Amino acid sequence: MCRLLGWVARERRSLRDVLGEESFVAFAQLSRIHADGWGVATADGAGLQGECSTSNAAADPVFRSVATNSTGQAGVAHLRWASPGLPVEPCNAHPFLHFRYAFAHNGGIYPFERLDEILTAEWQAKLQGTTDSERYFLAVLAEMERSNVDVVTALPRVLRRLTEEFTPSSLNAMMLGPEALYVVNCHDASLRPVLPPPEKQSVDELVEATEEEVPYYDLRYRRTDGTVVVASSGFAQPEGGGWRRIENNSLLVVDRATLEVTEIPLDVHIGLAVAADSAGADLR
């Protein structure tokens, strides 16, 4: 389980700059629980660069330096809370970078051990780590190559296969490419992970969410003068501050050239409580 943040701007900007100091501090503090690493990828034109770590972001001066000094016309940031059984290693830190794309995911896909089935041997050879998230990413790139289609076409095809053949808790993701920032909001809204106290960060359990809680998997975006920011829940995102909730089962596309925002409905639905009961998935 993780926290996602992405942006597109008319000019080069850093993570700290696009959030503002108060929201940046609040976002970084989410790593008290999402403490298994951080990553930031930034892009200008077709160029893409990134830095990742297995450290707790709030306690890592390198994170503060990267968040302040690494600038781009677009970017994606990630705070990791590792799923059980997936090692906390640099190769498993998000965002993953392959070719001209960066990708970060929040959620789990079960059964993990079957995920290699969605990749050919050629694409399996490109894997750098052991996560379900990187396999999800490479499946999208593979579909783009196989069918000669763009991200907007490939993503729904991969999402459909993942929901039909596997049991995901959430497929929420951000994919940054040369043309746009693509944000997938596709999750079981009836569930949330149990958030442990900061001193105990290894728990990863899903329970029914209550109506009083801000849903863990919610995503929102905000348009300001020359910048669009998209973020997971966890820090203040008031409607009065311009934040708008992204509908579940939708794909948000932020054009990097125009900053135009398009929300596309997805014919994909996750019902984890039902699927887990029938599939016997381990959702700890």
Each PLM stretch: what is its role?
Residues M1-F103, I109-R284:
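N-terminal segments that mediate ammonia production and transfer
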